[in-house]
Amino acid sequence: MKPSVILYKALPDDLLQRLQEHFTVHQVANLSPQTVEQNAAIFAEAEGLLGSNENVDAALLEKMPKLHATSTISVGYDNFDVDALTARKILLMHTPTVLTETVADTLMALVLSTARRVVEVAERVKAGEWTASIGPDWYGTDVHHKTLGIVGMGRIGMALAQRAHFGFNMPILYNARRHHKEAEERFNARYCDLDTLLQESDFVCLILPLTDETHHLFGAEQFAKMKSSAIFINAGRGPVVDENALIAALQKGEIHAAGLDVFEQEPLSVDSPLLSMANVVAVPHIGSATHETRYGMAACAVDNLIDALQGKVEKNCVNPHVAD
């Protein structure tokens, strides 16, 4: 008899078929308490769990006594109670490598669109404001040869540095938990403390996961240290930034503009002051949102669950020690 797994996000037909070759697959709409209660017998028997954008906490795990592995279609896993999973010896699999290049593309797009005011001036054209040769009130700022500060030099940070260094001749500053020799050798990146990075960078790109240590890492104090001409980019996790402090910094002119792919609360409220600011480019968490990459992430998550339930945790496992 095949192991039972619960799928809480739709998959392309071929990936669903691959999953069904290995498991008895039960599809549910979400992991809400109501859904769990309505499908209590299925949850009680499930050995695997696959999906994204739902919280997996201790309360849910209590309803799943046979769960051995959960696989998320994402690189981030801040919506999982890792301690609770680990205490129950449940493997947590994720997709850390598939989306690197695509998210770096999104970051570079935010850099360019904020600096050159692409969204703002495109809307002015659509509104019929282009009635003569444009003047300084339509101008943006250069990207090439400007200093890029990267906070978080992981895979995505490296991919962004590659684009900035080779494509735009940008000097690279970075702050991370440790020195990154490859970044320094390939891109002539310079390691510095966070205060120095904030004071010297023309663009500050935040690419950090959400942890207890990074929650509200960026607040009023950090924005006050940035150049008034600086542009702030966040494509990591929204709660790493105190959004009210960011709004205040933009309103007071402490920073020039912001390009944001993530927010403290998602979806972003239609009443957010960010949406009324012409110098803010706000997009709906599209970092990895291309057809190719989302398919690749789903395929990786399927393979991860198959591997995990077969005892193979050599890669893409957040807590591999539970398999020991």
UniProtKB/Swiss-Prot annotation:
Source organism per entry reads: Shigella sonnei (strain Ss046)
Q: What is its EC number?
A: 1.1.1.79, 1.1.1.81
Which Gene3D superfamilies does the entry mention? NAD(P)-binding Rossmann-like Domain (3.40.50.720)
Q: Which domain of life is it from?
A: Bacteria
Which lineage is the organism of this entry classified under, starting from the top rank? Answer: Bacteria, Pseudomonadati, Pseudomonadota, Gammaproteobacteria, Enterobacterales
Q: Which terms are listed as keywords in the entry?
A: Cytoplasm, NAD, NADP, Oxidoreductase
UniProt keyword Lyase present: no
Where does the record say this protein resides?
Cytoplasm
Active-site residues? Answer: R237, E266, H285 (proton donor)
Q: Which family is annotated?
A: Belongs to the D-isomer specific 2-hydroxyacid dehydrogenase family. GhrB subfamily.
The function of this protein is: Catalyzes the NADPH-dependent reduction of glyoxylate and hydroxypyruvate into glycolate and glycerate, respectively.
Matches recorded under CDD domains = GDH
Q: Name one GO cellular component term.
A: cytosol
Q: What are the annotated disulfide bridges?
A: none
How does the record describe its quaternary structure?
Homodimer.
InterPro entries recorded for this chain? D-isomer_2-hydroxyacid_DH, D-isomer_2_OHA_DH_cat_dom, D-isomer_DH_CS, D-isomer_DH_NAD-bd, Glyo/OHPyrv_Rdtase_B, NAD(P)-bd_dom_sf
Q: Which transformation does this protein catalyse, written as a reaction?
A: glycolate + NADP(+) = glyoxylate + NADPH + H(+); (R)-glycerate + NAD(+) = 3-hydroxypyruvate + NADH + H(+); (R)-glycerate + NADP(+) = 3-hydroxypyruvate + NADPH + H(+)
UniProt-listed Pfam families:
2-Hacid_dh, 2-Hacid_dh_C
Q: Name one GO molecular function term.
A: NAD binding
Protein name per its UniProtKB record: Glyoxylate/hydroxypyruvate reductase B
